Amino acid sequence: MISWLKGEKVHTWKISSRKGVVLNVGGVGYEIQLLPKQIDKAEVLNEFELWIHQIDREDGTSLYGFIEVNQRDLFREIISVNGIGPQIGMAMLEEFEVPQLVNAIENKESNLLTKTQGIGKRIAERLIVELRNKLQRFTDNDKTIHENKNDIEANQFSKYIDEIYLILNSLGYVDNEIKESIKIITINEKENSLLLNSSSAEEKADLMDKHLKEILMKLSEKST
């Protein structure tokens, strides 16, 4: 059973709504499905370290990769629920960050869970019944999710800035240019952190597009 892989990216792929990478690990190519929100990072990084969940079937083996181990472990809990397959599990982790999803399940927020494509009211309620008392380990390192909300938001904002940095770096901009230009985002860190925390994956992508356009416009003005 494969649990973790580190290797060089040789290809990114897309099949319908599924996206992923092929990693060269010791001369062997592993095809791994990723969360779509991780694909932007996949486009600019050459080396990956991924936590893996492996599913073996008669027609082949499927690998699901995650940047963070708690994403992989929560994915395993989700697909242990009767009627929920790996694609719905991936969709849920695409829609929500781990703390948000754990919080929704523990607080019986079935309406929030149904925001995920493929999750109806009945499946959402089944998730809550089967998992709400099994997720304590995801919050053991924190007093409660609510008490650490500010830390979670700050961490999300930091990751968001890192992604923007990588994209700008891949476009040829240097460190000093990037650090100066992203001040238009960091100057409103609190506001943008709250916005990120309450946004869906699609809304986050739209926000990133908006910020990138603003930054590129600022960089263009400086070069003229």
From Swiss-Prot:
BP GO terms, sorted: DNA recombination; DNA repair
Subcellular location: Cytoplasm
SUPFAM superfamilies found in the cross-reference section: Nucleic acid-binding proteins, RuvA domain 2-like
MF term (GO), any: ATP binding
Region Domain II, annotated ranges: 68-146
Positions of region (Domain III): 157-224
UniProt source species: Prochlorococcus marinus (strain NATL2A)
Family of the protein in this entry: Belongs to the RuvA family.
Domain-related comment: Has three domains with a flexible linker between the domains II and III and assumes an 'L' shape. Domain III is highly mobile and contacts RuvB.
Oligomeric and partner information: Homotetramer. Forms an RuvA(8)-RuvB(12)-Holliday junction (HJ) complex. HJ DNA is sandwiched between 2 RuvA tetramers; dsDNA enters through RuvA and exits via RuvB. An RuvB hexamer assembles on each DNA strand where it exits the tetramer. Each RuvB hexamer is contacted by two RuvA subunits (via domain III) on 2 adjacent RuvB subunits; this complex drives branch migration. In the full resolvosome a probable DNA-RuvA(4)-RuvB(12)-RuvC(2) complex forms which resolves the HJ.
GO CC field: cytoplasm; Holliday junction resolvase complex
Record keyword Cell cycle present: no
UniProt keyword list: Cytoplasm, DNA damage, DNA recombination, DNA repair, DNA-binding
Stored InterPro entries: DNA_helicase_Holl-junc_RuvA_I, Hlx-hairpin-Hlx_DNA-bd_motif, NA-bd_OB-fold, RuvA, RuvA_2-like
Stretches the record annotates as Flexible linker: 147-157
Keyword Ubl conjugation: no
Biological role: The RuvA-RuvB-RuvC complex processes Holliday junction (HJ) DNA during genetic recombination and DNA repair, while the RuvA-RuvB complex plays an important role in the rescue of blocked DNA replication forks via replication fork reversal (RFR). RuvA specifically binds to HJ cruciform DNA, conferring on it an open structure. The RuvB hexamer acts as an ATP-dependent pump, pulling dsDNA into and through the RuvAB complex. HJ branch migration allows RuvC to scan DNA until it finds its consensus sequence, where it cleaves and resolves the cruciform DNA.
Gene coding for it: ruvA
Lineage: Bacteria, Bacillati, Cyanobacteriota, Cyanophyceae, Synechococcales
Annotated segments matching region Domain I: 1-67
Protein name per UniProt: Holliday junction branch migration complex subunit RuvA
